[in-house]
A protein has these predicted regions:
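CheY-like receiver
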Residues: 7-12, 137-179
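Short amphipathic alpha-helix used as the core "switch/output" element in two-component signaling
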Residues: 9, 75-91
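Conserved acidic segment of CheY-like receiver
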Residues: 9, 15-36, 46, 65
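A short, hydrophobic beta-strand element within the central beta-sheet of small alpha/beta folds
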Residues: 20, 65, 91-102
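Alpha4 helix (beta4-alpha4-beta5 surface) of REC/receiver domains from two-component response regulators
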Residues: 33, 78, 91, 102-117, ...
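Short hydrophobic/Thr-rich beta-strand motif most characteristic of the beta2 strand and flanking loop
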Residues: 41-48, 56
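Active-site beta3 strand of CheY-like receiver
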Residues: 59-71
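C-terminal output helix
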Residues: 123-136, 140, 144-145
Length: 179
């Protein structure tokens, strides 16, 4: 297993201090638990169902949530959608979806309900660390709209677009910049 250095672990600490794992498979949950503890997690809570996951999320106020995509009494997309549209303090917390069903459709579905990262099974410790690093050290803007609540789905927004403006707000921003 990869052993990250202390400075890296210190940068992850605010995100990985309290972790919620929602997975009906005890072995998979144990693997994620062990990896998160090696990254400095002080408190890891595991739940097997969507309903319990939502209850615990409200009480625990985790810094990071892992959810399996599907299982008995668990729909990871429904969990994430409900969390994102709730009034819980943790509604903006990074969610990493874990599944063996990594198709374009499932990845798009997860992205469209507000999942930050997608982790395909089987995965290595390096795969998990990379996802945790992405959510902890490369935060994305938050978007709230009628049909979507979650992190900005544009992962690689350079902000250096120099083409024609297409929105009224773009034109207004351009006028302010010229003034």
């Amino acid at each position: 297993m990869l052993i990250p250095d202390r400075r890296f672990l210190a940068r992850l600490e605010p995100t990985v201090g309290r972790v919620l794992i929602i997975d009906p498979n005890a072995h998979a949950a144990r693997l994620i638990t062990d990896l998160m503890k090696s990254l400095g997690a002080r408190e890891v809570v595991v739940e097997a169902t969507e309903a319990r996951g939502l209850q615990v999320a409200g009480a625990l106020d985790p810094g990071l949530i892992f959810t399996e995509r599907s299982g008995p009494h668990l729909d990871g997309e429904s969990f994430t959608r409900t969390l994102r549209r709730s009034h819980m303090a943790c509604r903006r917390v990074p969610v990493i979806m874990v599944t063996s069903e990594a198709t374009a459709t499932t990845i798009k579905g997860a992205r469209d309900v507000g999942v930050h990262e997608f982790l395909r099974k089987p995965f290595t410790s390096a795969d998990l660390i990379k996802r945790v690093e992405n959510v902890a050290l490369k935060p994305r803007d938050w978007v709230e709209g009628v049909s979507y609540v979650g992190p900005d789905r544009r992962r690689f927004n350079s902000g250096e677009y120099a083409g024609p403006s297409k929105r009224k707000s773009d034109c207004a921003m351009g006028a302010e910049a010229e003034a």
